[in-house]
Each structure stands twice: as C-alpha cells, then as structure tokens.
C-alpha cells in the first residue's frame, strides 16, 4: 500500500471526522474507523465516480437514437396488435358478440388510452 501525504481543506477534514464519529456511534471499533482508512475509502469512491463520468463521456447517451428505437418498437407493437385484433374479431367463438367486433374493440381501446393519457397529461383549457 502506497503512503501519500496530502493537504486537504478544513471543511473536508471536518466532514471526514464526522463520518468517523458517526461510525463509532454506530458501534464500529476504534481501529476499524481510522482517519486514514476513511480518507482512503472516500478517495477510492471518488476515483470510481470520476472513471464512471469519463466512461459516460466516451459513450454518451444518444436521445435521438433512443427515441427512434422506442418509436419503432411502439409502431411494430401497434401494427401487431391491430392484426391480432382483426384475427380475433373473425373467430367463430366471439361472432355475434358486439363487444368483440373490430370497430367496437378499437373504439374501446381509444377511450381507455385517452383516459390514461388524460391522467398523466391533463388537457389545458387553452387547447
């Protein structure tokens, strides 16, 4: 283990001591929560955060690509469900039941979607 001498601000020093005190109050032994061990743990944690940030910069999230992929999946799902509803409405098991006629199923879905959308995106009086 390498030994390093460094200077830190009084604020950082007080915060590290506060962490040590809190751990001791929680029952940690004196030798388990030394200033050196706590400062080392915080330094390692800071390095991991720094590395994660650098990694994120290299492989930045592409919102446009995500939106495109999401829209593609939604359109595929919508198209598939429309075909399945069409097939289901022709089934002899549901013939004569207006609840399962294609036009009625579509209207029912639109009403339910509209209701859910209103919950999350209430309409303004201006619209």
UniProtKB/Swiss-Prot annotation:
Entries under Pfam families matching the protein: Tra_M
Record localization: Cytoplasm
Outcome of residue 106 to A? 2000-fold decrease in conjugation efficiency, but tetramerizes and binds DNA normally
What keywords were assigned to this record?
Answer: Coiled coil, Conjugation, Cytoplasm, DNA-binding, Plasmid, Repressor, Transcription, Transcription regulation
- Annotated effect of mutating residue 99 to E: 100,000-fold decrease in conjugation efficiency, but tetramerizes and binds DNA normally. Binds less well to TraD. May be dominant over wild-type
**Coiled-coil intervals, chain numbering:** 63-89
In alphabetical order, the GO MF annotations are: DNA binding
- Asked if the record carries the keyword Repressor, the reply is yes
Q: What does this protein do?
A: Conjugative DNA transfer (CDT) is the unidirectional transfer of ssDNA plasmid from a donor to a recipient cell. It is the central mechanism by which antibiotic resistance and virulence factors are propagated in bacterial populations. Part of the relaxosome, which facilitates a site- and strand-specific cut in the origin of transfer by TraI, at the nic site. Cooperatively binds 3 regions in the F plasmid oriT locus; 2 are required for autoregulation while the other is required for plasmid transfer. Bends oriT DNA less than 50 degrees. Plasmid specificity is conferred by the TraD-TraM pair.
Entry similarity comment:
Belongs to the relaxosome TraM family.
Record protein name field: Relaxosome protein TraM
Natural source organism: Escherichia coli (strain K12)
List the gene name.
Answer: traM
């Amino acid at each position: 283990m390498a030994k390093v001498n460094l200077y830190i601000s009084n604020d950082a020093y007080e915060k590290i001591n506060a962490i040590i005190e809190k751990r001791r109050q929680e029952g940690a032994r004196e030798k388990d929560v030394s200033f050196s061990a706590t400062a080392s743990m915080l330094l390692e944690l800071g390095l991991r955060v720094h590395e994660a940030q650098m990694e994120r910069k290299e492989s930045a999230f592409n919102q446009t690509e995500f939106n495109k992929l999401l829209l593609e999946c939604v359109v595929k799902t919508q198209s598939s469900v429309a075909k399945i509803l069409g097939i289901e409405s022709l089934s002899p098991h549901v013939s004569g039941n207006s609840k399962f006629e294609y036009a009625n199923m579509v209207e029912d879905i639109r009403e339910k979607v509209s209701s859910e959308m209103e919950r999350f995106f209430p309409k303004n009086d201006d619209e």
